[in-house]
Design a protein with these regions (language model features):
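Conserved nucleotide-sensing/catalytic segment adjacent to the nucleotide-binding pocket
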Residues: 25-73
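Short glycine-/polar-rich loops that comprise or flank the Walker A/P-loop
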Residues: 12, 41, 68-70, 89-93
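Conserved glycine(s) of the Walker
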Residues: 2-3
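Hydrophobic positions on the alpha1 helix immediately C-terminal to the Walker A/P-loop
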Residues: 6-7
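Short regulatory helix/loop adjacent to the ATP-binding pocket of P-loop NTPases
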Residues: 80-95, 106-111
Length: 191
């Protein structure tokens, strides 16, 4: 969805917990002194915070100490294995990001809106200059920025396939440590 890239555009400093060279040391440091990872010019990005869930509570504590809003940007794509002690209510706002729409990727005029369809818009209709093959490709490719910007259609489709495969093979088990049958999940998605 471009969460990290979007946050990087706003951040003045950053910590990347998924960095293969520094990540393990940063996660270990978060165990003993999480406040160190909050240091840096603000707004300060903490990418993949869920790898060290205690950072959530450290951010909450830092926010309680004052100094204004918008000091920290926490990005992550998975549910933390260990829940933070505090919800962050009143201190931390969540922003849900979605893949790009066809309108955002300039593959649609936006004349017909999915939201409008669900809201019961009286008049729904438009003519598209896109072929049914183009629309089917865009639906299969998805709206992930890397895939949308990829000029080679095969690579763009492979990125979507790889994303779904990774989600089914590992990410979905990390949500709650329950093993799921990825073959069964793939069959559901194919149906």
């Amino acid at each position: 969805c471009g969460k990290t890239e979007t946050a990087k555009q706003q951040a003045q400093s950053a910590v990347y917990l998924q960095d293969p060279d520094e990540g393990p040391s940063l996660v270990a440091l978060a165990e003993v002194r999480p406040s160190v990872l909050l240091e840096g010019a603000e707004p300060h990005l903490i990418d993949e915070w869920q790898m060290a869930p205690q950072l959530w509570d450290a951010v909450r504590f830092a926010v309680d100490q004052g100094k204004g809003k918008g000091r920290f940007l926490l990005t992550g794509s998975a549910t933390p294995k260990k829940r933070p002690k505090h919800s962050g209510v009143g201190r931390i706002s969540r922003m849900h990001m979605r893949p790009m729409s066809l309108f955002e990727s300039r593959e649609s005029t936006g004349a017909v809106s999915l939201a409008g369809l669900f809201d019961g818009a009286a008049e729904v209709g438009a003519i598209s200059d896109r072929s049914i093959e183009d629309i089917a490709f865009a639906l299969c490719r998805g709206g992930w920025p890397e895939a949308v910007l990829e000029s080679d259609p095969e690579i763009a489709l492979d990125q979507a396939k790889d994303y779904v495969a990774e989600l089914l093979d590992s990410d979905i088990d990390e949500m709650d440590d329950k093993k799921r049958n990825s073959t069964w999940l793939r069959a559901i998605l194919r149906s």
